[in-house]
């Protein structure tokens, strides 16, 4: 079986970079793109920030209030409301460029995509490096956007590799360098291993990739269950056979509200939720849409977020 060659393309600090493209004079300033709430003032959270702002500890999910405190010494800091229509327009132009180079194109989100280029470059990693640079150059020329690209024989390694040399990076993981590449990573760098999993492993004295590779699959399944345990066992060995699947951008219709006050009163929250559903129902009926996934995202007092999703066989609101 011939070697697959998969690219993962990730646009660098996407929302903030779009704002730099719109206003180049802001490039030397900390830029913070915010999701402002209906409460006014500094109520809300950071959607993303450029690398200058990140040096001061400003990251996604931080409250705007705390972000401003951390950037207090930077009087040139800029806090901007998210403009998703503008970001989507740049994303669409960039994705259309990427599609030209792919045998199979998989859209992941506004700022990332997978490409299977195996046939186009005849399974040649040297040509994969060249085509990756061509993609980067064309996106920069036509949209002024920079991106980071990971190249490997599977989606998992390419995803990790695209994050390896950010921003504006290009990392190729050759088949005979997989073990060395993974050994140099932190456990948290493995896609799919979150903070809680890392903490659980640390409790067992597993603090490095090498430690983690010493655990057999049965131990990992016992700790995390069959699905997660097996995934971790394979991931730290660079094993992943998931195909690149053609996928177009999905349409999302949602209504978001910030309550006038924090509350744990069930009746009050139910009333607010039903009002949102009524508003959303009107939009769906007006646009004659069908849907298959319903989600309710919730942000708590300290900005910890949680989302519950339900998949439906088929449904249309009437």
State the predicted function of each range.
Residues 108-112, 152-155, 289-293:
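Short Gly/Ser/Thr- and Asp/Glu-enriched loop/turn motifs at secondary-structure junctions
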Residues 18-20, 44-47, 157-165, 244-246:
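Short acidic, glycine/serine/threonine-rich loops at helix termini
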Residues 127-184:
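Long, highly charged, low-complexity intrinsically disordered interaction regions
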Residues 189, 202-304, 310:
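DNA-contacting surface of Y-family translesion DNA polymerases
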Residues 115-132:
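Catalytic palm subdomain of template-directed nucleic-acid polymerases
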